[in-house]
Each structure stands twice: as structure tokens, then as C-alpha cells.
Amino acid sequence: MMQELKQSYIKTFDKDDVALSTNDLSVLYGGKVQKLFDASLQFKKNTITALIGASGSGKSTFLRSLNRMNDKVATVNGEIWFHGLDVNKPNINVYELRKSIGMVFQRPNPFPKSIRENIVYALKANGKTDKQELDKIVEESLRAAALWDEVKDKLDKSALALSGGQQQRLCIARALAVQPQILLLDEPASALDPVSTSKLEDTLKQLRSKYTMVMVTHNMQQASRISDYTAFFHLGHVIEYNSTAEIFTNPKGKITEDYIQGSFG
């Protein structure tokens, strides 16, 4: 098994092209159960990177560590580099960090408020009160999430009345409202029907020109359709990281090939 866990290939980029990177990132739960081992990855600006692997492979643990979502439940060792700072240091303000590195979760989680209030809630909490400015951000965020045309006449209606797919795009709009540079997505389409999934994928592809995105997915077809790069995780290790085209058509490692072909996982 140790032979299988050797890395096959880990792609790197020119320093100026990197939006976010990790160095020897490891995660332990309860101080003794290690779920991630020495993960070192670079994420290229304005691309979508898919994290794939079987359940329990460490991909979601890795993703949630990137903006310190695991702080209260796990010990995270190693480095996370963003704008020249190791943001895994204890002196980092994690709330400010999460404005720059946003998160969209597996299931839509709109606030039990109006569509408008879902977008402006965090902005108001951070001192923005000008109605004209807030209205502008609401429209821009909903347009970016490809939701504006569907909800522009019912912004004061409950967000809970939206369909599942609309709710997930609202959650993306809510994350975009605070102007992040990076968007983390943990299986964002897993609870959606095929039509809603297609709309969500189109939205993510449009956002790529402005944001860097890292997405966990169990859907191999989805990874191949919308991602530029793919990282394959297995038993807490990053086994292979390359362009999505290479991962799916010419994987370097046998274990990667087996997973892509559905031989395990």
C-alpha cells in the first residue's frame, strides 16, 4: 500500500500565477486521527481546480482548512500561503481571511431572511449602511451568480421560497458580495437536480474570469466539464495534480487511473 501512496505528479506554477498555496499541510482530529498528510499544492489564478477522491480521502478536510474552517475541530499543521502571508499562523484574523477566501457548502444554506437581506447581511455587519451602495452590490452579486433575472422582482421575498438550485446560486451571490478573491466549494451541486446543476456549472465557468475557485466533487463528469486542474486524493494523501485533461486522459499513476476508470472508490 505504501507504494501506491507515492505521489505520481504534482503540478507547479510560476510564483506570479499562484493565488493560494499550501506547504506540508496536515490535519489531525482529536490530536491523534490524521486525515491529511503533508499536502503541498498551488492554485493558479482565475482557474477552477477540482479535488477528487473517494469518501474519506481528505479532500473536504483539505478544502475547509484553506480558510481556517477546521480551527475548532482539528489541529492543522503546515503552511497556507496567501498574498505573501502564511495564513495558518495563530495571529491571523480568520474573519478577515474569510472575506478574501469565501466558502459555499454542500447543501444550500440561505438565511431565513429575504433574498436582499441574505446578500447585505454581512455587509451591514461590517458597517455598510448606504442604501444605494447596498442595492448596487445586491444587483452585481446576483448578476454574477446568474440569478438576477430570476429574482429581481421579488428581492423582499423569503430566500427559503427559492428552489434548491436558486438557493445555491444565492449562497454564491452572498459569498461574492464581500468581494473575495478565492471561492471554495464543497460539493456545491450534490443536492441539486441535473437542470440546476447545469445552471450552477455555467455560473462557475463565468465566474472564472474574476475568481480563483477550488471545488470538491464526487462527480467525475462535472470535474472534467468545468475544471482546469484536478487533484486526486487517496487516504489523506495528494497522489496526483495536473491539468484536468491530463488527469482524465493520461494519468501518471496507476491508482489515479483506477479511480478515474471506476475500479475503486
From Swiss-Prot:
It is a peripheral membrane protein. InterPro entries: AAA+_ATPase, ABC_transporter-like_ATP-bd, ABC_transporter-like_CS, P-loop_NTPase, PstB-like. CDD domains: ABC_PstB_phosphate_transporter. Keywords: ATP-binding, Cell membrane, Membrane, Nucleotide-binding, Phosphate transport, Translocase, Transport. Pfam families: ABC_tran. SUPFAM superfamilies: P-loop containing nucleoside triphosphate hydrolases. It catalyses: phosphate(out) + ATP + H2O = ADP + 2 phosphate(in) + H(+). GO terms for cellular component: plasma membrane. Part of the ABC transporter complex PstSACB involved in phosphate import. Responsible for energy coupling to the transport system. This is Phosphate import ATP-binding protein PstB 1.
